[in-house]
Amino acid sequence: MNGTYSYGTGRRKSAVARVFIKPGSGVITVNNKPVDEFFSRETGRMVVRQPLELTGNLDRFDILVNIHGGGESGQAGAVRHGITRALIDFDATLKPVLSNAGLVTRDAREVERKKVGLRKARRRKQFSKR
């Protein structure tokens, strides 16, 4: 990686994304694969491009992402969070636009643990009156 990169770390559920952006032609690479190949679902691709579309920078930056952990949805959210932070690192004037869209805040929702005596986190065994 040569040149000047702006960096942002994104997290969502158990996924962690390290995002590097630099001025370029709009190529997004996730774990050495094009974004359209890495995220098989269209929703994942839309989530990843959301901060770029919102700020009008879709074709202005080359983005390199290293991601591990989590599933497809969590990884897409982590990449979005990382791109948002990297854009703010590159140009702080974009922060109000991204903040109003709710992209700067880390989504703190995590999977609730399974409790002893229950089937799942909150699901109880069926109650039989007789």
Curated annotation (Swiss-Prot):
GO MF annotation: an example: RNA binding
A single GO cellular-component term on record: cytosolic small ribosomal subunit
Keyword annotations of the record: Ribonucleoprotein, Ribosomal protein
Keyword Repeat carried by entry: no
Any single GO BP term: translation
Pfam families named among the record's database cross-references: Ribosomal_S9
InterPro entries: Ribosomal_Su5_D2-typ_SF, Ribosomal_uS9, Ribosomal_uS9_bac/plastid, Ribosomal_uS9_CS, Ribsml_uS5_D2-typ_fold_subgr
SUPFAM superfamilies: Ribosomal protein S5 domain 2-like
Record Gene3D superfamilies: 3.30.230.10
HAMAP family: Ribosomal_uS9_B (MF_00532_B)
Family statement drawn from the similarity comment of this UniProt entry: Belongs to the universal ribosomal protein uS9 family.
Protein name, per record: Small ribosomal subunit protein uS9
